[in-house]
From Swiss-Prot:
One of its GO terms (molecular function) is peptide deformylase activity. It comes from the Bacteria. Its cofactor is Fe(2+). Pfam families: Pep_deformylase (PF01327). SUPFAM superfamilies: Peptide deformylase (SSF56420). Its EC number is 3.5.1.88. It catalyses: N-terminal N-formyl-L-methionyl-[peptide] + H2O = N-terminal L-methionyl-[peptide] + formate. This is Peptide deformylase. The keyword Transferase does not apply. It is an enzyme of class 3 (hydrolase). Removes the formyl group from the N-terminal Met of newly synthesized proteins. Requires at least a dipeptide for an efficient rate of reaction. N-terminal L-methionine is a prerequisite for activity but the enzyme has broad specificity at other positions.
Length: 179
């Protein structure tokens, strides 16, 4: 396993659309190593999720997982470890629940983004088994954020207002910009 370099905003790879993962790909040693590396990279950076494009791989692959309080997102609930291939998301509520999002590709900053609190997600797992699930709350927000990366979208593209964007140290624990 290896910690991979996380690409930062400005790198053109982050703005490209990823390709689907094929069933034959998931059987390869390289793909299995990629998944292990992604989990290790995510944990090393204290992230909740990581999309393959963030490490320069243009494949529709996301890993998520947060077992206990994450230092970057105190007070947030657990997110189960999950490998997600070729996701499709359908919003089931209007984009009204706001959250101060951060991103490993936009280090040291946060922005207020409103997203649907309830989604339907179809995806395949690491065994290429298809899943279809209704997801709500924090996990739904995390999954939408990570899946955006697969289509070249960063959370800064979804800011409610550029006035609600700043450095971590300028945002208090309640998510308000400090004066």
């Amino acid at each position: 396993m290896a910690v991979r370099k996380i690409l930062k905003i400005g790198n053109p790879i982050l703005r490209q659309t990823s390709e689907d993962v094929s069933e034959s790909e998931i059987q390869t040693k390289d793909f299995k190593k990629l998944i292990r590396d992604m989990f290790e990279t995510m944990r090393h950076a204290d992230g909740v999720g990581l999309a393959a494009p963030q490490i320069g791989v243009l494949k529709k692959l996301v890993v998520v997982g947060q077992e206990d309080d994450n230092e970057r997102y105190p007070g947030t609930p657990e997110v189960p470890n999950q490998i997600i291939l070729n996701p499709e998301i359908t919003p089931l509520s209007p984009p009204r629940d706001g959250f101060w999002e951060g991103c490993l590709s936009v280090p040291g900053m946060r922005g207020y983004v409103e997203r649907p609190n309830k989604i339907r997600m179809k995806w395949r797992d690491e065994n290429y088994v298809e899943h279809d699930e209704i997801i709500e709350g924090y996990r739904a927000i995390v999954l939408q954020h990570e899946c955006d990366h697969l289509f070249g979208v960063l959370y800064v593209d979804r800011l409610k207002s550029t006035k609600l964007f700043g450095y971590n140290e300028d945002i208090d624990t309640a998510g308000k910009l400090l004066d």
